[in-house]
Amino acid sequence: MERISTFNDFINEGRSKWDSFASKLTSAVFKTWIKGYENGMTEINYSDQIESKLEFDLNATIFIDKQYKGFEVIDGTGADGRDDDDEGDFQTPFINIYFGINPEWLPGEWSEVYFHLADVMRHEMEHITQDGIDHGNYRAGKPIEDDSQMRALIKLGLLPQAQYMMLPKEVDANLQGLRYEAKKRREAMIDAVNRYLDTQEQGGVIDGTEREEI
């Protein structure tokens, strides 16, 4: 009889296999950003072709500008783990990370930038393992069903944004990202989850009823 994976199996798999890898990448990006900031740069990019354990291109940029009220995760942040693009052409899976921060928040809020970077890095790495069979990235048991139609309907506003958070691929990625952030902050995972849901509710993305459902 095939053994059914439990929630603890899922969490422990992420902890044992990918946390050290996520830590290495997070540290490399963060050190590049810090060095660029100290050298007076206002747009600091880190890019790399990852070929160890997983295969994907990593692009991570932070913009330091007064147009941002505080700290923001900018649109365009995300991952595409597919072997083929929308036109059916072969592509290398990729992770793009774009952060923006007001210069008045630095250097005091670098620790918050780091914690958010850890969350996003681990979140997007989880997406890489949900696809990319030809690249050897897909890991058995991960949700791989095509959810592009649901995502499109949500983006068009035809379905509530809360549905996005309940897509199987997003549930797994959110849990691993928030778990990893909590580990870095040395806090309980529930604290990281509640803080994330607080920001979504306060931003009007979800309401109280949807929060309970999530």
Predicted regions and their residues:
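Auxiliary, metal-adjacent structural segments of Zn-dependent hydrolase domains
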Residues: 17-95
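Post-HEXXH active-site segment of zinc metalloproteases
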Residues: 115, 131-165
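Short acidic, low-complexity intrinsically disordered linear motifs used
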Residues: 1-14
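Active-site recognition of the HExxH zinc-binding catalytic motif
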Residues: 119-132, 173
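Hydrophobic (often cysteine-bearing) scaffold residues that line and stabilize catalytic clefts
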Residues: 114, 118, 169
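Long, well-structured alpha-helical subdomains associated
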Residues: 31-37, 149-214
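Active-site scaffold of zinc-dependent metalloenzymes
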Residues: 72-115, 128-132
